[in-house]
Regions:
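Short, ordered loop/turn segments at secondary-structure junctions
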Residues: 5-11, 25-36, 76-81, 86, ...
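Beta-strand/loop-dominated core regions that host nucleotide or nucleotide-derived cofactor-binding catalytic loops
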Residues: 489-492, 499-523
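C-terminal accessory/binding modules appended to enzymatic or scaffolding proteins
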Residues: 237-259, 444-488
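Active-site beta->alpha loop and helix N-cap motifs at the rims of alpha/beta catalytic domains
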Residues: 1-102, 233, 244-347
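Hydrophobic residues within beta-strands of alpha/beta enzymes
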Residues: 23, 72, 115, 179-180, ...
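Catalytic alpha/beta core domains of metabolic enzymes, predominantly
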Residues: 41-54, 58, 63, 85-235, ...
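Non-catalytic positions within long, well-ordered alpha-helices that form the structural scaffold/packing
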Residues: 15-16, 108, 172, 255-256, ...
Length: 526
């Protein structure tokens, strides 16, 4: 496939259409001027005239593609929407879909079917909503083009894998997507094994036994919002999702950057543990203590009423949600559900359970619970992120509980916090938006990312874009608070939001100047 970044008069597009198998175009700059973040006012007639300009330029290119059997990829990126689209729709999924549909409608009118679509964002919430909206819009117009999935600027290491699995995995769980790319700020050869593991995991659930379920009336898969649940001791409602760490194996080593809110100790005696931990204890081993709470299983549900405690947990699966169980959950205002699954399609089973609770009008808080047996940390990251991420982006889940046999418990804790960060449901650390690098990157991206992380990783909630070049960097940083963008060999430009505030800084001074910029704007903490 041939990528064209900017082509002022369509020449490069037309020449490449006769020489390669596929050409990628970006609707954000195909006809519209380079993005300036300006607000433009159009009458309906003027707006229609702008779309006609697209047709005048696009149709000759399509004709060359037809003559040579060349396919095209319409690649819409959240960070490179045109000022025209931004002015009418804002920086929204609706704007991304509108930008794509302008070109798709011309393709259909010109009887040109050889089209692949990619529509990407670095924000997983935006990415998933946009693709779901695009599919809905295409289906309404009887369009069925292949979709390529990806999370742009996902970053590196654990964060890059988790963010990619949340976005791509959610859509694959929906049955959406024909090809994928995992974009990591690492050596290119690192991407393919990660993508393969993710696809293989989703395929494991093929031909699973059917799940008999219904979607709650009025549930909108595009405009999702968090399910309304009652509050039980700070769990549910508008409180951030909690993290429950399974320490029933006796592993009590902690990473104090990823401290869980609760720990499950099973049959362990709570008297053997310090008072500063909030503990889940199997109900029949529970002792009345201010920091200990009983945990029941489905067969013990009738015993819930016998325990005088402000917070109780019960582990349930979809199949446990009988009419009687729903009555118990509605009546007892101190209970929180740990929603588990043993089904091969665990996401489908847990989705079914959440919709059953919605339809029953049961507002019990729900902590999503999964069990894995992975010695491969990367596989654990991908599997848990794809599964939990799907439900969180649907608006489900007042907390997470991840148990894994094969790795230390702190690995599971970091995964849970990373997934909540990637779904933007709970922010616990600095977020980095970094590109996968390309030939335009004229500095050592991986080393630079490591240096910036070392200097800024304590700035909880701050978003920092680290981009290879000036061509796509400013746009692709999305909603970053600060940006570090390559400006030429040995030179860096720094951004505050979308504004370039320092240009052509020597690379050796750039990280220090970034820290200084953050301090000057009052966003630094020691």
């Amino acid at each position: 496939m041939y990528y064209v970044t900017l082509d002022a008069d369509n020449t490069v597009y037309c020449i490449s259409a006769g020489e390669v198998e596929k050409v990628r175009i970006n609707p954000g700059n195909y006809v519209d001027k380079v993005k300036t973040f300006s607000h433009l006012e159009y009458t309906d007639e003027e707006y229609a005239a702008e779309i006609e300009k697209i047709r005048e330029r696009f149709v000759p290119f399509l004709n060359i593609c037809k003559a040579h059997g060349t396919a095209i990829r319409i690649g819409v990126n959240h960070g490179s929407l045109s000022d025209r689209i931004m002015s009418r729709y804002g920086d929204t999924p609706e704007g991304m879909v509108a930008s794509c549909m302008e070109f798709l409608r011309i393709c259909r009118e010109e009887n040109f079917p050889d089209v692949v679509i990619s529509i990407k964002a670095s924000n997983t919430v935006v990415m998933v909503r946009t693709v779901r909206l695009l599919v809905r819009t295409m289906e309404a117009e009887n369009m069925h083009y292949p979709l390529h999935l990806g999370v742009t600027e996902a970053g590196d290491g654990e964060d890059g894998r988790i963010k990619s699995a949340v976005g791509i995995g959610t859509l694959l769980c929906d049955g959406i997507g024909d090809t994928i790319r995992v974009s990591l700020s690492e050596d290119p050869e690192a991407e393919m094994p990660v993508a393969r593991k993710l696809v293989d995991y989703i395929r494991e659930r093929e031909n699973h036994r059917p799940i008999e379920a219904s979607m709650a009336p009025g549930f909108d898969t595009v405009a999702t919002s968090r399910r309304i649940s009652r509050v039980v001791e700070g769990i549910g409602g508008t409180f951030s999702p909690v993290v429950i760490s399974d320490r029933s194996s006796g592993d009590f080593e902690f990473d104090y950057l990823s401290l869980p809110d609760y720990i499950y100790i099973g049959k362990e005696d709570p008297d053997n543990l310090p008072d500063n931990f909030r503990l889940l204890v199997d109900a029949h081993f529970w002792k009345e203590r201010p920091n200990a709470f009983p945990c029941f299983i489905a067969s013990e549900a009738e015993e819930l009423k016998d325990y005088d405690c402000p917070l109780k947990f019960i582990r349930l699966t979809y199949m446990d949600l009988t009419d009687r169980m729903l009555e118990i959950l509605k009546a007892d205002k101190t209970v929180v559900v740990l929603l588990s699954t043993h089904h091969r399609n665990g996401v489908g089973s847990q989705r079914a359970a959440m919709h059953k609770l919605l339809m029953a009008g049961c507002d019990v808080p729900v902590v999503l619970h999964r069990d894995f047996r992975e010695t491969d940390v990367e596989l654990l990251q991908l599997k848990s992120a794809a599964d939990f991420g799907t439900l969180l982006l649907d608006g489900f889940g007042d907390g997470l509980m991840l148990h894994n046999e094969g790795c230390e418990a702190v690995v599971s804790d970091r995964c849970m916090f990373g997934i909540l960060q990637a779904t933007r449901t709970r922010i616990s650390k600095t977020e980095y938006i970094s590109c996968p690098s390309c030939g335009r990157t004229l500095y050592d991206l991986q080393t630079t990312i490591a240096r910036i992380k070392e200097a800024t990783s304590h700035l909880k909630g701050l978003k920092i874009g680290i981009m290879g070049c000036i061509v796509n960097g400013p746009g692709e940083m999305a909603d970053a608070d600060y940006g570090y963008v390559g400006a030429g060999r040995g030179q860096i430009s720094l951004y505050k939001g979308k504004e370039c505030v320092l240009k052509n800084i020597p690379e050796e001074d750039a990280v220090e100047r970034l820290v200084q910029l953050i301090k000057e704007n009052g966003d630094w903490v020691n």
